[in-house]
Amino acid sequence: MGKIIGIDLGTTNSCVAVMEGGKPVVIANAEGLRTTPSVVAFSKTGERLVGDPAKRQAVTNADKTISSIKRHMGTDYKVEIDGKKYTPQEISAMILQKLKSDAENYLGEKVTEAVITVPAYFNDAQRQATKDAGKIAGLDVKRIINEPTAAALAYGLDNEHEQKIMVYDLGGGTFDVSIIEIGDGVIEVLATAGNNKLGGDDFDNAVTQYMLNDFKAKEGVDLSKDTMALQRLKEAAEKAKKELSSTTQTEINLPYITATAEGPKHFEMTLTRAKFDELTHDLVEKTAEPVKNALSDAGLTASELSKVLLVGGSTRIPAVQDKVKSLTGHEPSKTLNPDECVAIGASIQGGKLAGDAGAGDILLLDVTPLSLSIETMGGIATRLIERNTTIPTKKSQIFSTAADNQTAVDINVVQGERQFARDNKSLGQFRLDGIPPARRGVPQIEVTFDIDANGIVNVSAKDLGTGKEQHITITAGSNMSDEDIDKAVKEAAEFEAQDKKRKDAIDARNEADSMVFQTQKAMDEAGDKLDASDKAAVETDLNALKALVDGSDPENMTDAQVDEIKAAKEKLMESAQKLFAKLYESQQAAGGAGPDMGAGAGPDMGAGASNGSAPYGDDVVDGDYKEV
């Protein structure tokens, strides 16, 4: 069985880990970093960028850069780029593809399976959208698990003594708090609460708005309509937020932020931690109610907790840590890396599903975060499954008709805690027809809710009189049809193929460029020891290859150009081999050592060679790079 990777698909940053040698390992991305910005961009040439390359160019390409797409999962939101509309699932799939590719490069094998985490307070539509994103990215999502639960799994792997902990998870876009009991090889979620619209992005926005207001007051210029200036302000706000976690004030300097008739304008500000705390006070306060609700639902007081774990980058904010301490009376534990522990927990679950002994025998018991109901007469939301019910679970209830001779019933499935169906999230509607005419209240219709281990809901209705049954077909606009998903899968595969093709083209060009340099270097070192006629042939081939390399754009090479470069490289390799073989033979006959030309008897062009064989290696990789 292949490896099952664990992915923390975050609002602002994502992370991937895997079980290796019985231990969870965080996988560094192609840029050498352990987390990847959840940012996707399309360059002016149409190239797709994901992660750090996408984030770096956001200032100059704000209109085609997409961030925090996770906040739109499970909705009918679409982003339009170059005339094409993308769903949140498709954009998320691009991030997942990047993480998948990084994992494959690390493991040296194909990866097709994953465990992906979601905020505990994600509803059914958001969970299904996450699963669809995985499918589009070419991943079989073996399990969807809640982020706080994953963090507890990472913590509980080495801490199995009995304890009750709180996981306080404040990420880039969402907030979750879970009360979890650990002991006897079981990790059981007792209760969960949260806010899907609260996270680090909101802290950044508060600072950005303050900066906008300050500049407008001082200079009379509204920067909110200037996309490039606004992007610079947002990046500066995020940087300032991070710096204020370790210092009491920071300087924000953005030269040439805009220009007026009077000339260029510069943005300068000193932001103190006290001012930052004032700007974000209401956001920190919003975490209090979910904490109280989770404790209440778990039937515990804060004093009964053994520990409070901090998860998510936003928990580094000192005011957040102070709030946690005031709410719980506990000094929050910093045992876990808040950026990586969720991915680590997901990889442990992946290892468990793959049969990895290092994942241990921990049993994971999670809960559904929101109550599930159907709409009954008067628009009432009649609950079948209460929130914080351990999953997987199944519950059935008998309902009947509301009018005489009613032959069909429309069933509206809702998720949430409000008393009326209209105030909750509708998961979908379906109709059970063919009910024999009868007096009101006579037909018996059994409605069954089935929540799987991923927290995804399946609903069916059965007429017990006729045996006729109907399963739910989600009609909410946020869900992609099977046809849409299949189409997106194909497009994602095409993008992957395009990316590989582009990389192969750049590799071919770089190898050719390296060969031109190394051959010229070796010829210069050998000087007049080379046979004149053979040297002329090599110079002709070298110049031909150099012209092809110089005349190609590494970002936009055609197949014909790549083939030409490869053919010219082979031709140069052949003539150079002949030239340096002759030189080697003449030096051997004369008993001389010849010029210093690397490990073998030829120029220093990769893997050395002996006995007149070519000193070239096909796997030479040029160290030059271009930063985008």
Curated annotation (Swiss-Prot):
Pfam families: HSP70 (PF00012). Residues 591-605 have a biased composition (Gly residues). It comes from the Bacteria. SUPFAM superfamilies: Actin-like ATPase domain (SSF53067), Heat shock protein 70kD (HSP70), C-terminal subdomain (SSF100934), Heat shock protein 70kD (HSP70), peptide-binding domain (SSF100920). Gene3D superfamilies: 1.20.1270.10, 3.30.30.30, 3.30.420.40, Actin, Chain A, domain 4, Substrate Binding Domain Of DNAk, Chain A, domain 1. Keywords: ATP-binding, Chaperone, Nucleotide-binding, Phosphoprotein, Stress response. Disulfide bonds: none annotated. One of its GO terms (molecular function) is ATP-dependent protein folding chaperone. The modification Phosphothreonine is found at residue 174. Induction: By stress conditions e.g. heat shock. Residues 589-628 are annotated as: Disordered. InterPro entries: ATPase_NBD, Chaperone_DnaK, Heat_shock_70_CS, HSP70_C_sf, HSP70_peptide-bd_sf, Hsp_70_fam. NCBIfam families: PRK00290.1 (NF001413), prok_dnaK (TIGR02350). Belongs to the heat shock protein 70 family. Acts as a chaperone. This is Chaperone protein DnaK.
